[in-house]
Protein backbone atom coordinates (compact mmCIF):
# COMPACT_ATOMS: atom_id res chain seq x y z
CA UNK A 1 0.00 0.00 0.00
CA UNK A 2 1.59 3.26 -1.11
CA UNK A 3 1.40 6.58 0.69
CA UNK A 4 -1.16 7.79 -1.86
CA UNK A 5 -3.48 4.80 -1.42
CA UNK A 6 -7.07 5.60 -0.48
CA UNK A 7 -8.18 2.89 1.96
CA UNK A 8 -11.82 1.96 1.37
CA UNK A 9 -14.38 0.18 3.54
CA UNK A 10 -17.45 -1.07 1.68
CA UNK A 11 -20.68 -1.66 3.65
CA UNK A 12 -23.73 -3.43 2.24
CA UNK A 13 -21.28 -4.54 -0.42
CA UNK A 14 -23.54 -6.77 -2.49
CA UNK A 15 -21.31 -8.32 -5.15
CA UNK A 16 -18.81 -5.45 -4.97
CA UNK A 17 -20.20 -2.71 -7.21
CA UNK A 18 -18.48 0.16 -5.42
CA UNK A 19 -15.21 -1.77 -5.31
CA UNK A 20 -15.36 -2.59 -9.01
CA UNK A 21 -16.08 1.05 -9.86
CA UNK A 22 -13.48 2.63 -7.60
CA UNK A 23 -10.65 0.19 -8.23
CA UNK A 24 -11.45 0.25 -11.95
CA UNK A 25 -11.25 4.04 -11.96
CA UNK A 26 -7.88 4.26 -10.22
CA UNK A 27 -5.17 2.11 -8.67
CA UNK A 28 -5.19 4.57 -5.76
CA UNK A 29 -8.27 2.85 -4.24
CA UNK A 30 -7.79 -0.25 -2.13
CA UNK A 31 -10.73 -1.94 -0.45
CA UNK A 32 -9.36 -3.15 2.88
CA UNK A 33 -12.59 -4.40 4.50
CA UNK A 34 -16.13 -5.08 3.38
CA UNK A 35 -19.37 -6.40 4.79
CA UNK A 36 -22.20 -8.21 3.06
CA UNK A 37 -24.99 -9.92 4.98
CA UNK A 38 -28.51 -10.76 3.86
CA UNK A 39 -30.62 -11.50 6.93
CA UNK A 40 -33.68 -12.77 5.09
CA UNK A 41 -32.04 -15.76 3.44
CA UNK A 42 -30.06 -18.83 4.47
CA UNK A 43 -27.96 -18.65 1.32
CA UNK A 44 -25.54 -15.74 1.32
CA UNK A 45 -25.26 -15.60 -2.48
CA UNK A 46 -23.97 -12.02 -2.77
CA UNK A 47 -21.31 -12.72 -0.15
CA UNK A 48 -20.27 -15.90 -1.97
CA UNK A 49 -19.95 -14.01 -5.26
CA UNK A 50 -17.96 -11.24 -3.54
CA UNK A 51 -15.53 -13.75 -2.02
CA UNK A 52 -15.19 -15.66 -5.30
CA UNK A 53 -14.26 -12.46 -7.12
CA UNK A 54 -12.08 -10.72 -4.51
CA UNK A 55 -11.06 -13.39 -1.98
CA UNK A 56 -11.77 -13.71 1.73
CA UNK A 57 -9.22 -11.24 3.07
CA UNK A 58 -11.07 -8.40 4.79
CA UNK A 59 -14.49 -9.88 3.97
CA UNK A 60 -17.15 -9.96 6.68
CA UNK A 61 -20.33 -11.98 6.24
CA UNK A 62 -22.09 -11.15 9.47
CA UNK A 63 -24.96 -8.95 10.53
CA UNK A 64 -23.63 -5.37 10.55
CA UNK A 65 -25.65 -4.78 13.73
CA UNK A 66 -23.29 -7.17 15.53
CA UNK A 67 -19.97 -6.02 14.07
CA UNK A 68 -17.98 -4.05 16.64
CA UNK A 69 -16.62 -0.81 15.18
CA UNK A 70 -13.21 -1.78 16.58
CA UNK A 71 -13.19 -4.71 14.11
CA UNK A 72 -13.44 -2.33 11.16
CA UNK A 73 -9.99 -1.05 10.19
CA UNK A 74 -9.35 2.67 9.97
CA UNK A 75 -9.95 3.90 6.45
CA UNK A 76 -10.12 7.03 4.30
CA UNK A 77 -13.38 6.42 2.43
CA UNK A 78 -16.57 4.70 3.59
CA UNK A 79 -18.86 3.57 0.76
CA UNK A 80 -22.12 1.71 0.66
CA UNK A 81 -25.44 1.21 -0.99
CA UNK A 82 -27.48 0.88 2.17
CA UNK A 83 -30.60 -1.25 1.72
CA UNK A 84 -33.25 0.41 -0.42
CA UNK A 85 -36.26 -1.87 0.06
CA UNK A 86 -37.96 0.56 2.44
CA UNK A 87 -37.65 3.37 -0.13
CA UNK A 88 -38.02 1.43 -3.37
CA UNK A 89 -40.78 1.57 -6.00
CA UNK A 90 -41.19 -2.14 -5.25
CA UNK A 91 -43.39 -1.01 -2.36
CA UNK A 92 -45.94 1.78 -2.32
CA UNK A 93 -44.67 5.01 -0.83
CA UNK A 94 -47.49 5.01 1.72
CA UNK A 95 -46.44 1.54 2.93
CA UNK A 96 -42.70 1.96 2.75
CA UNK A 97 -40.99 1.93 6.13
CA UNK A 98 -38.34 4.49 5.24
CA UNK A 99 -35.63 5.04 7.82
CA UNK A 100 -37.78 3.24 10.39
CA UNK A 101 -38.45 0.20 8.17
CA UNK A 102 -37.06 -3.30 8.58
CA UNK A 103 -34.02 -2.57 6.41
CA UNK A 104 -34.22 1.23 6.36
CA UNK A 105 -32.98 1.26 9.96
CA UNK A 106 -29.64 -0.05 8.70
CA UNK A 107 -28.76 3.57 7.86
CA UNK A 108 -28.14 3.93 11.61
CA UNK A 109 -25.38 1.32 11.43
CA UNK A 110 -23.50 3.61 9.05
CA UNK A 111 -24.03 6.45 11.52
CA UNK A 112 -22.95 4.23 14.45
CA UNK A 113 -19.72 3.24 12.74
CA UNK A 114 -18.87 6.82 11.74
CA UNK A 115 -19.72 8.12 15.21
CA UNK A 116 -17.78 5.42 17.07
CA UNK A 117 -14.72 5.91 14.87
CA UNK A 118 -14.47 9.36 16.46
CA UNK A 119 -11.19 11.04 15.52
CA UNK A 120 -10.41 8.08 13.26
CA UNK A 121 -13.57 8.39 11.17
CA UNK A 122 -12.94 8.45 7.42
CA UNK A 123 -12.39 11.78 5.73
CA UNK A 124 -14.74 10.85 2.90
CA UNK A 125 -18.08 9.09 2.43
CA UNK A 126 -19.88 7.92 -0.69
CA UNK A 127 -23.38 6.41 -0.46
CA UNK A 128 -25.99 5.35 -2.99
CA UNK A 129 -29.71 4.69 -2.78
CA UNK A 130 -32.90 4.93 -4.83
CA UNK A 131 -34.29 8.37 -5.67
CA UNK A 132 -37.39 7.75 -3.54
CA UNK A 133 -35.15 8.21 -0.51
CA UNK A 134 -35.73 11.93 -1.09
CA UNK A 135 -39.50 11.68 -0.55
CA UNK A 136 -39.67 9.27 2.35
CA UNK A 137 -41.83 8.85 4.36
CA UNK A 138 -45.06 9.61 2.50
CA UNK A 139 -46.65 11.48 5.41
CA UNK A 140 -43.59 13.67 5.99
CA UNK A 141 -41.96 13.85 2.58
CA UNK A 142 -38.23 14.39 2.78
CA UNK A 143 -37.92 13.77 6.51
CA UNK A 144 -35.69 10.70 6.22
CA UNK A 145 -33.29 12.34 3.79
CA UNK A 146 -33.14 15.44 6.00
CA UNK A 147 -32.32 13.21 8.99
CA UNK A 148 -29.52 11.51 7.06
CA UNK A 149 -28.03 14.84 5.94
CA UNK A 150 -28.33 16.33 9.45
CA UNK A 151 -26.75 13.22 10.98
CA UNK A 152 -23.77 13.51 8.66
CA UNK A 153 -23.47 17.24 9.36
CA UNK A 154 -23.52 16.51 13.11
CA UNK A 155 -20.50 14.26 12.55
CA UNK A 156 -18.66 17.11 10.81
CA UNK A 157 -19.22 16.11 7.18
CA UNK A 158 -19.94 18.66 4.48
CA UNK A 159 -22.25 16.77 2.16
CA UNK A 160 -23.20 17.10 -1.50
CA UNK A 161 -25.85 14.96 -3.13
CA UNK A 162 -27.28 14.41 -6.59
CA UNK A 163 -29.87 12.26 -8.31
CA UNK A 164 -28.31 10.69 -11.38
CA UNK A 165 -30.12 8.73 -14.08
CA UNK A 166 -28.02 5.97 -15.66
CA UNK A 167 -29.79 6.56 -19.00
CA UNK A 168 -28.15 9.99 -19.20
CA UNK A 169 -24.77 8.24 -19.24
CA UNK A 170 -25.51 5.83 -22.06
CA UNK A 171 -26.90 2.94 -20.03
CA UNK A 172 -29.86 1.09 -21.58
CA UNK A 173 -32.14 1.69 -18.59
CA UNK A 174 -33.72 4.50 -16.67
CA UNK A 175 -32.25 4.02 -13.23
CA UNK A 176 -32.39 7.10 -11.04
CA UNK A 177 -30.17 6.92 -7.97
CA UNK A 178 -29.34 9.31 -5.17
CA UNK A 179 -25.62 9.72 -4.48
CA UNK A 180 -24.32 11.30 -1.28
CA UNK A 181 -20.68 12.39 -1.17
Language-model features, listed with the residues they occupy:
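Conserved active-site and SAM-binding loop architecture
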Residues: 1-181
